[in-house]
């Protein structure tokens, strides 16, 4: 239990820093619910974390009905990570790296945060939760589903962020995916 709590706290800290310190200053996107929250933030000025919570409500209702295990394993991750993303919003002014470095570092931090939570069988919910629910009924690969959803989210933000930032956002979601995969690999698999 302590490991899961620490994973949620540290993972959420990494998400908050990755999103606000590296993605937001350049108007870059991540995939999933974070990406949708960022699109709403860039377009309407809405708080990213709070937007993530509101947009996740239908998925959590569905999870409650179809598979309560997914509901309970991800609700705390969604709430804490959304809080940290909004608490760390002021740091977007502090770090001023180039867009290429920010896309990579932001993606690595976000991926590490998500991967750490997944390693301890929790998550931020959102589209990860959607992918798990789709997998339950259609036996499609969860990783592939998440990657496809992330790509669609970034593609949907193309008009808001423009082509150049879209390309850098593709680099970001690639880094997120790679780092997430590395974090969830069991230690004995690496050795």
List each language-model region with its residue ranges.
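Core subunits and conserved enzymes of cellular information-processing
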Residues: 1-191
